[in-house]
Amino acid sequence: METHFHEWQKSLQLIQQKSEELQREQIQLKSFERELRIINKWFYYGLHYEQKLQLARHPKRPTSLDYIEGMSQDWIELHGDRKGSDDQALITGIAQVEDETIVFLAHQKGRNTKENLQRNFGMPSPGGYRKALRIMNHANKFGLPLVTLIDTPGAWAGVEAEKEGQAHAIATCLQTMFSLEVPMISVIIGEGGSGGALAIGVSNWMMMLEHAVYTVATPEACAAILWKDASKSAEAAEALKIGAEDLLALGVIDEIIPEPIGCAHQDAASMTKRLKQKILRRLKQLKILSGKQLRAHRAERFRHLGYYVE
């Protein structure tokens, strides 16, 4: 690069110096970005269970609809349980994802306070599970693969839900999912809480996002039951083994999907692309099996949960 300039070249010299300055800054910026990626990766490695729970409940974490709409060319939501209810906490529908026509069942939290009130914070009522049951049977009738996205603190436990038969609605979903003869994949994208999560989680392949949680009861509820003190939720979370790594080691889930640096809410587009690739890959493998083989595979998978030898 030229270093000697005549007087009439001064303006060119200034531009060249500015260019060199910007290049140095660009190099520094790239170096800083590399360091930031390393720090971010280290920062989110080995989080405590309570911290994972906070990430799973992050208000900006992508919802089921964010993923479905991001993955599909056209999403058609199917409404109602045909018994007078259309629960907004559990959405159902059909979508075209590349070459696959997929039926989705998904918990849906709100993206803001108003939506959360409409969707009951992602806690389905019996009508929601009856709607899911209706759509499951549609998927089975037409031979369409079923994908469920799980993100709920649990099924709604209010008095009205009990009056409407919450336990029966969940039990019927569980029974039906074991009988379906189509490929079934479940993905825990945020909170997987109690029977409310399990009700749409009987599948051939269970995946879980890196910072999602899956538990028999919320840590707060567990602490209140065991120690009569909800403030001991951190100890309860530790005892429940709610994180993806422990659940993979225990055989409760089959695969962990890594999240982008800084978690899913920092790069929803990248997370959606990753989730889509995983779902399509697993569906391709499951579609090789016959209906009877899929049923047997599902039953065998659940029979081995909690299995141990003394």
UniProtKB/Swiss-Prot annotation:
A Pfam family hit: ACCA
Keyword rRNA-binding: no
Phylogenetic classification of the source organism: Eukaryota, Rhodophyta, Bangiophyceae, Cyanidiales, Cyanidiaceae
Biological role stated in the UniProt entry: Component of the acetyl coenzyme A carboxylase (ACC) complex. First, biotin carboxylase catalyzes the carboxylation of biotin on its carrier protein (BCCP) and then the CO(2) group is transferred by the carboxyltransferase to acetyl-CoA to form malonyl-CoA.
Assembly description: Acetyl-CoA carboxylase is a heterohexamer composed of biotin carboxyl carrier protein (accB), biotin carboxylase (accC) and two subunits each of ACCase subunit alpha (accA) and ACCase subunit beta (accD).
Pathway: Lipid metabolism; malonyl-CoA biosynthesis; malonyl-CoA from acetyl-CoA: step 1/1
Single GO MF annotation: acetyl-CoA carboxylase activity
Keywords annotated in UniProt: ATP-binding, Chloroplast, Fatty acid biosynthesis, Fatty acid metabolism, Lipid biosynthesis, Lipid metabolism, Nucleotide-binding, Plastid, Transferase
GO cellular component terms, A-Z: acetyl-CoA carboxylase complex; chloroplast
Limits of the CoA carboxyltransferase C-terminal domain: 31-285
Subcellular location: Plastid, Chloroplast
This protein's record includes keyword Nucleotide-binding: yes
EC number from the UniProt entry: 2.1.3.15
SUPFAM superfamilies for this protein: ClpP/crotonase (SSF52096)
GO biological process: fatty acid biosynthetic process; malonyl-CoA biosynthetic process
Entry protein name: Acetyl-coenzyme A carboxylase carboxyl transferase subunit alpha
InterPro entries per the UniProt record, alphabetical: Acetyl_CoA_COase_a_su, ClpP/crotonase-like_dom_sf, COA_CT_C
UniProt similarity note: Belongs to the AccA family.
Enzyme class: transferase
Catalytic activity: N(6)-carboxybiotinyl-L-lysyl-[protein] + acetyl-CoA = N(6)-biotinyl-L-lysyl-[protein] + malonyl-CoA
